[in-house]
Amino acid sequence: DLVSVLDAFEKKFGHLIPRLKWVNMGGGHLLTRQGYNVDLLVSTLRDFQTRYPGIQVILEPGSAFTWQTGDLVASVVDTVEHDGINTAILDVSFACHMPDTLEMPYTPKIAEAVDAGGIAYRLGGNSCLSGDFKEGYRFAEKLKIGDRITLCDMNHYTTVKTTMFNGVHHPDIVLADADGQCHYLRRFSYDDYKSRMS
């Protein structure tokens, strides 16, 4: 938490802090999460600024603004069973559309998955990269072509860390109203990939 990080920062580098122009308190502060102690955050930052006036404090709330606001909806385009491993190939890519699932690793909740029982699946991405898959999901029934897979809470990194590796198509960005009406905000095409290459 920020309080312990700041305490360690001041203990190790307190003699240097007065010479700084700014200090970055980092990211990952889920200010919008239910139960987040905003009052503690505010008092911690105010106390720091009182001790070190004139230093600009930077805070990166980042994902807090889009946390639990965007799902990535995929479809199963093929299924394979080999050596006892069930694989469902999706029309999205873990490497291209959600690299945080491989780098961090962040394991998104899947709305259609079950916690226990069911059938274990490896979910494969649609790029040619050998590591473009995610394991550890279970489904109540065998997946079939056309089944919908909803990867929850994907907005915070999906839109900023994507790549169009080898022309992999990006998913559309859609706003769904409370009544279920969908409005397309952005549809990607080959021209988006082509413009990045020139």
Where are these regions (language model features)?
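Charged (often Lys/Glu-rich) extended helix/loop segments that serve as interaction or gating elements
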Residues: T44, Q56-S198
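Active-site loop/helix belt of alpha/beta enzymes
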Residues: D1-H82, N166
